[in-house]
Amino acid sequence: MNNFVFYSPTEFVFGKNTEVQVGALARKYGAQKVMIVYGGGSVVRSGLLDRVKQSLQEAGVAYCEMGGVQPNPIDGKVYEGIQLCRREQVDMMLPVGGGSVIDTAKAIAAGALYDGDFWDFFIGRAKVEKALKVAVVLTIPAAGSEGSGNTVITKTETLQKLGLCAPEHLRPVFSIMNPELTYTLPAYQTACGIADIMAHIMERYFTNTPYVEISDRLCEGTLTAIIKEAYRVKQQPDNYAARANIMWCGTVAHNGTCGVGREEDWASHALEHEISAIYNVAHGAGLAVIFTAWMAFMAEHNPAQIAQFAHRVFDIPKSEDLEEMALAGTARLKHFFRYMGLPVSFKELGIEHPDIDRMLVSLQRNKGELLGNYVKLTMTDCREIYRLAL
């Protein structure tokens, strides 16, 4: 196990009707004026936005708002939000939604207190040294942004989809999580969220770091739980227990708990970011395609941890042939994704002829010559993984 620092100060308020506490919590954390950030009309139609506003009013917290955040969030809304934030003298960001909304709010929180272009943070030209506080009302379990210091934004001019990690400044001070708010999610969106959650765990799980049994078991237990609950929610979309477990899995998957003391990989996310940046597909769907291709590649090149995953998560019998075990586990994961209605190939994703050369040029520009840690991938390796996903 490697040395580590684990810092996770977010206050999670979980359960039915918890959104009505948002005003009191915002006041508790010193907010005078918040910016509510949201996406489409669902938070309006459901009455959630009105409940949030009423709670803020009752607590004496002023607010302004910005809607229209799209999936795979773009830089344009961040620039718009920064201007609004400064004009309205906001001191706390309050995203009401899923990962795209939260990530947009985090980028605004960092950019509002920075004299330059917020994109400087994403390309490594500047480091986040201060930011507005961020608080969350979560409606879509997937990205885990409600408990992480991460944000991912796409720059439309260059189609660069890049991430930023600044946990000291961008991890939410509190997150409200009511599983009932997820009842009305379409089945495909629920499935994409589950794939995203699983990918966050697997990026941490597939490691060469020895003697990490406790975090191995945390990863495996969380994966096993979410697979079980996914089957249940597929049949019973309004099952509170299933929705609650999936929502909490999303947080545990990405708040750092599963990755302590171990070298993480993150190659699959980088490979997928090129797909969703260029083709604007759902991130979770892209991950279902890429992760199974990545695992098939690793079955040949470094099968040990893939084989352990196959045995402990999907009950594949132990064998001396680790590659065979790894491929069997990958096949079971593909079967699960397909059952959930997810694609496991570019064709199923709706991309008949992916421009692999274009993706590789962008990938190399964004990430350099080598990718990941489980196996250091060259651009030739990355081409092969994209090819395996055809």
Language-model regions: role of each:
Residues 1-29:
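N-terminal amphipathic/basic leader segments beginning at the initiator methionine
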Residues 19-22, 45-48, 75-76, 100-106, ...:
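Short glycine/serine/threonine-rich phosphate/pyrophosphate-binding segments
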Residues 35-36, 92-94, 135:
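Conserved beta-strand elements of the Class I
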Residues 44-116, 232-243:
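N-terminal small/polar loop signature for handling phosphorylated ligands or for N-terminal nucleophile
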Residues 113-211, 308:
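A glycine/threonine-rich phosphate-anchoring loop and its flanking beta-alpha core
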Residues 204, 208-332:
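Active-site segments that bind and position negatively charged phosphate/pyrophosphate groups
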Residues 306, 313-390:
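C-terminal charged capping/lid subdomain of soluble metabolic enzymes
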